[in-house]
Amino acid sequence: MDTTARFAVALRSAAARHGDADLCVFAGDIADQAEPEAYRLFDSLRRALLIPQCVTLGNHDDRNVYLTYAENFETDPNGYVQCRRDIKGHCVLVLDSSEPGHERGGFPAPKLAWVAEQLANARRSGLKVIVILHHNPAALQMPVDTYRLSAPSDLLAVLKQSGADILQVIAGHCHISSAGSWGGLPCATLAGNHHRVEPFLRGRTGRQQCYEGPAHYGVVVSNGSDCAVHFEAYVGEADPMDGTLFPRKVDQAFEEVG
């Protein structure tokens, strides 16, 4: 699979369909084996995307290598690749769940302290919070749970004890798109740019099938009270149906926002 070509398709899709977006987040696993040339290629490809961007890391990345060879990155005061964006009444927290050498990543005390500080600030400012990280914190009742975020209760405690209004938690890592909750917080996962896995739930044995598509990125739309996460398939969409079967689907009206 040519993931570079796929990434280029994703960027073109985002620019064409969502060019007015306020932020584009690249949520980790930027490279497969933390290759310097992969980080350079990633930066060269995303330069053409005019949407403001944030990047964080996943278990296939190496923070030291990334910080050495990448460009236009952001870190917190402790050197973790995580950032915050305040956008139209929302605080978007992009968290670095990676820990080099540990597939499950994690949130040691310095990371959690930064998260707690940002949440406290968001609460004081009356901002709604959207959290984005690489490792899925919620159990999907699939084998991937054995390498989901380590000690997820540590992060959950910081989020809930903050008193901040958390609209959504979004993760990748598991190669499947899902929606549910994590400790009472809305939580979604995205299949991402590489392969997608089939739902392989408890009780099943044998091989879990992997598929080349569809590849998904997420589109988050929020007005502060209603927050939707759309799974946008940019590779592997099924063939479109005859449009004459759905006459209402032309020049449709949207619900008025009060």
Please report, for each region that a protein language model flagged, where it lies by residue.
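Short glycine-enriched, charge-decorated loop/helix-capping segments at active-site entrances
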Residues: 1-2, 71-72, 101, 141-148, ...
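Active-site glycine-centered loops adjacent to acidic/histidine catalytic or metal-binding residues
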Residues: 28-29, 58-59, 134, 172-173
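His/acidic metal-ligating clusters that form di-metal
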Residues: 9-23, 105-186, 218-219, 247-258
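Binuclear metal-dependent phosphoesterase catalytic core
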Residues: 158, 181-258
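Short active-site segment of divalent metal-dependent hydrolases/proteases
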Residues: 31-32, 62, 137, 176
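N-terminal active-site segment of His-dependent metallophosphoesterases
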Residues: 1-41
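Extended active-site neighborhood of metal-dependent phosphoesterases/phosphodiesterases
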Residues: 35-125, 154-165, 183, 191, ...
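Feature marks short, surface-exposed loop/turn motifs that line or immediately flank catalytic pockets
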Residues: 63, 101, 137-139, 196
